[in-house]
Amino acid sequence: MSLFRLEFLRVCRSASYIAAVTALVLIAYFQNVFPPSARIVAAGAEIAADGLETCVLAAGDYALARDVDRFSGAHARLFASRVGGALAVLSAFPAAALFWHDRRGCRAAVCARSVSSWKLVFCRYAALTAAMALPVAVMALTLTCVAAMDYGPANVDMLAYGKYALFWILPTIALSTAVGLLPAALTGLPLGPLLALLWGWRARSAPAFAYAALFAPRHEALGETARFLENVGALARGRVAAALLGLALCALAAFAVEWKRRGRGYALRFGRRAA
């Protein structure tokens, strides 16, 4: 069995991962993006009597939501904004927990000469990222079906949720995972989640539209497609920077594990050296 698969299964069985996924689904539900709480309609349009709330857009904004976003894109953008904000905090917890448990039960895996530090850390990083992306993929698939039922399959972009999950949310997961992983690898202490929680606390006062944000871009509106199109370049640069920074932090974590393997890294813990 490959190291990636072993790490992936270990992550999926961990209590911290199960708790993070549960919290993610609950946040998505209470943030009204899983499932969506409103259907997009044009100003002056007849309201369907099916009990679903409506989001009335001005004629120009509705035309963009219909022709550019094809409805599902507008919902997917709000989904990515709110779920991405939650994952910026939650993804750090399983990463920190895994290295925290290594202090007791998996020290042999860290010190084993048969597996390089770089392979171990990057396989673990990939497994953590894939595991946190899994519930997002399931929700994206479910919401694509919901959009097709609400607007008709011919009227929606069937790939919209997948594109936003891949290009908007995945870099957030990658960066937050690295933030959880690096302090735990350096010190053996779960400091990464504290940093993520601090960011989450400060993000409460962030502007509703922040496309260049490194951790989690924001687009807190169902619609506003023109604003999004004007800032898509800033969004792309921020997403690339987040992914590259996540990889850089992961490389630093691998260096820290290698340092410990050679008997020098324990000086990082309160000045003590390995015996």
Model-derived regions, located:
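An acidic-aromatic pocket/loop used at catalytic or ligand-binding sites
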Residues: 104
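Terminal transmembrane helical anchor/hairpin motif
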Residues: 34-45, 61-71, 194-275
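Secretory targeting signals
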Residues: 20-51, 55-101, 121-191
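Short helix-to-coil transition segments within interhelical loops
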Residues: 110-118
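Hydrophobic transmembrane alpha-helices
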Residues: 5, 176-184, 250, 254, ...
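Membrane-helix interface/capping residues of multi-pass secondary transporters
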Residues: 15, 117, 189-190
